[in-house]
Amino acid sequence: RFYLCLHPFSGRLMKKKKELLRVFQTSDRLLAILIDPDKVNFSKLENLIEHLPKATTHLFVGGSTVEENLTEKLVRQLKAKTPLPIFIFPGDYTQITNEADALLFLSLLSGRNPEFLIEQQVKSVEKLKNTSLEIIPTAYLLIDGGRETSVQRVSKTLPMKQENVQAIVNTALAGEYSGKQLIYLEAGSGASTKVSTGIISAVKKEVSIPIIVGGGIRSKKE
């Protein structure tokens, strides 16, 4: 899965959050590849790394439903095979591992299920108290990609309709106003329709924090 961020990330490991975010806030684009621990073939991991697009700047690791400790196993093996920074993108708190470089600390703002608005975050605190992970508060907005996604099933929430641009913009702004440092617009794994350029432009015009766009992106050109 391809993920586009409207701001770049350096290939070197950042140790201070202010440095990491400063790099995010520059003007170029970057490309992240999401690897789901529950779907990856570990025996072919080296081949997967070798065939990553040349434009890849970092990796996301995570999924909606992942066996406990599998994320840590995958991150550890990836770190041994690539210098690319690894961000964990957890579907729940059990996927958090200190082996990664950074954590997208997600709040599902497009839905109203308290489990994914705050309860998973509270459950993660004991793991995060003494972590070396860069923790990045992230507003996560599920956008309708034309088919039901695993995020929708697991979270028991509905995605935001693509035609409701103002509602999407307002939700993104609410995320920024509440202290989030990234906006994540997600059409979902296997989406038949990616987040429209109109939505991306409208959100980018209104927010002052970086935007990540994912789901339905099948090529570097997209």
Predicted segments with their positions:
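Alpha/beta enzyme core
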Residues: P37-V66, E72-L84, P90-S132, I136-Y140, ...
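A structural signal for short, well-ordered beta-strand segments and their strand-loop junctions
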Residues: C5, F87-I88
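N-terminal amphipathic/basic-hydrophobic helices that include classical n-h-c signal peptides
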Residues: R1-L13
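N-terminal amphipathic alpha-helix/helix-capping segment at the start of soluble metabolic enzymes
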Residues: G11-I35, K127-P137, D144
